[in-house]
């Protein structure tokens, strides 16, 4: 009986914790991040689209991230950014793929640095910094295409829709 009561209480606490994490009144810092890879992303030497690896780095400050080179950020960001690095995550997108992520950001993180491992680094925008609002939900949509990674805004979408119809 005691064991059943403890398990019931743990279950209820789990439900309450889950509700707090999705509540609009939550004090967590959250990031809803949508990533879309174009059909022609990250072409190889033969012009074939290829998967692209994306690293998300939670940062206290973006300055050192913005000044570091790709290989440092990609292979040893934690060591290269000791005062700014908080956490990181890696994912891979295939050409034409879309991912929607719901992330809880660490309380000390103020920015998320995006590093996209393009094959042709000198000719693309491979780095991006996203500010995150403390104890709020930040929503961002990113597009990874032939020119690099960029924030995909509703205005850009309407403009692209208009041009597609002409």
Enumerate the language-model features and the residues they cover.
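C-terminal motif of bacterial Sec signal peptides marking the signal peptidase cleavage site
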Residues: 15-18
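Bacterial signal peptide processing site
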Residues: 20-23
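Tryptophan-paired
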Residues: 68-105
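Bacterial N-terminal signal peptides that target proteins for export
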Residues: 1-9
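Extracellular beta-sheet/turn segments enriched in Thr/Pro/Gly and aliphatic residues
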Residues: 38-40, 131-166
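A short, solvent-exposed beta-strand micro-motif common in secreted/extracellular proteins
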Residues: 109-119
């Amino acid at each position: 009986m005691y064991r059943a009561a403890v398990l019931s209480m743990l279950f209820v606490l789990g439900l309450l914790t889950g509700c707090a994490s999705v509540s609009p009144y939550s004090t967590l810092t959250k990031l809803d991040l949508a990533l879309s890879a174009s059909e022609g992303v990250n072409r190889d030497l033969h012009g074939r689209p290829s998967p692209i690896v994306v690293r998300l780095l939670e940062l206290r400050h973006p300055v050192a991230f913005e000044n570091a080179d790709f290989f440092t950020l990609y292979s040893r960001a934690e060591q290269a950014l000791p005062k700014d690095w908080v956490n990181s995550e890696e994912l891979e997108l295939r050409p034409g793929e879309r991912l929607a992520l719901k992330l809880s950001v660490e309380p000390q993180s103020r920015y998320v640095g995006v590093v996209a491992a393009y094959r042709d680094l000198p000719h693309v925008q491979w780095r991006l910094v996203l500010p995150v609002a403390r104890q709020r939900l930040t929503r961002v949509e990113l597009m990874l295409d032939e020119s690099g990674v960029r924030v995909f805004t509703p205005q850009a979408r309407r403009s692209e829709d208009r041009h597609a119809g002409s």
